Amino acid sequence: MRHLITAKDFNKVEIMELFKEASDFLDEKPRTFLKGKSITTIFFENSTRTLSSFESAARRLGARVLRLDVSRSSSSKGETLYDTAANLDAMSPNAIVVRHANSGVPLILAKHMHCPVVNGGDGKHAHPTQALLDLFTIYNHFQGDVEGKKICIVGDIKNSRVAASNIELLSRFNLDITLVAPPHFMPNTHLKKHYKLDENIIANSDIIMSLRTQTERHNKTVYASLKDYANDFCIQKSLVKDKKLILLHPGPVNRNIDISDEMMSDERTLVLKQVKNGVAIRMAVLKKLILENEG
């Protein structure tokens, strides 16, 4: 049984096959690959973009979508994770997409399911489809020439599952990664790191990936105000200038904290392209896992 718990679950050849399939899906035309199939989404954390993206992907492939309302589910009434898995499995879905605040939950569910489980984000651990869509966006922009491209990841890296998944995946494709964050947001790492964003760092980057400050994962107040954080880490036109690069963000963007209003409207900012690419990548992932499982 194949699952997608981390980006490591797909090798480089498989990822390139996903990219080829996703490129075809960018036309947004409905397909029937998963006609008659059922996909269950169960998100224990709030989500707009990721949940909507997965559900759009499933429907464009012809699948039915069952969204479980966690606030009203038995899990909110004390049901164990094992019982939740057993009940989900009894519904005989063809795939389950799960998001949870605790790292490891998708893997635990996968051990008890008879269908593919896709991790829609678990704690600080992983967000594999976000990393795949980010690399897909980079790959398309540079027409496949990504090896050696310099990417600067800026923000709350230590608490970000997006950063964790991207660092693993981008390293496999030999991108040159630099991390920029205040000391309390910087993980232990062998990668190049800086504690303040400046013009020189941006001038030496092909890609900037800005991250949201994960205030919900902080045990204590780090900044008196997010504006204090923005003074050192907000991506602004005055820093970027006319540098030829692309700017990414997994969303939601805290405007004028993560990225300035001016840069959000800049043609180098590909946030909306990431959203479009995300649906296509998730279509490719769902198709691959479900059809391989039943093949």
From Swiss-Prot:
Pathway: Pyrimidine metabolism; UMP biosynthesis via de novo pathway; (S)-dihydroorotate from bicarbonate: step 2/3. L-aspartate binds at K77, R161, R212. Carbamoyl phosphate binds at R49, T50, R99, H127, Q130, G251, P252. GO terms for biological process: 'de novo' pyrimidine nucleobase biosynthetic process; 'de novo' UMP biosynthetic process; amino acid metabolic process. GO terms for molecular function: amino acid binding; aspartate carbamoyltransferase activity. It catalyses: carbamoyl phosphate + L-aspartate = N-carbamoyl-L-aspartate + phosphate + H(+). Belongs to the aspartate/ornithine carbamoyltransferase superfamily. ATCase family. Heterododecamer (2C3:3R2) of six catalytic PyrB chains organized as two trimers (C3), and six regulatory PyrI chains organized as three dimers (R2). Catalyzes the condensation of carbamoyl phosphate and aspartate to form carbamoyl aspartate and inorganic phosphate, the committed step in the de novo pyrimidine nucleotide biosynthesis pathway. HAMAP family: Asp_carb_tr. PANTHER family: ASPARTATE CARBAMOYLTRANSFERASE, ORNITHINE CARBAMOYLTRANSFERASE, MITOCHONDRIAL. This is Aspartate carbamoyltransferase catalytic subunit. The lineage of its organism: Bacteria, Pseudomonadati, Campylobacterota, Epsilonproteobacteria, Campylobacterales. The gene is pyrB.
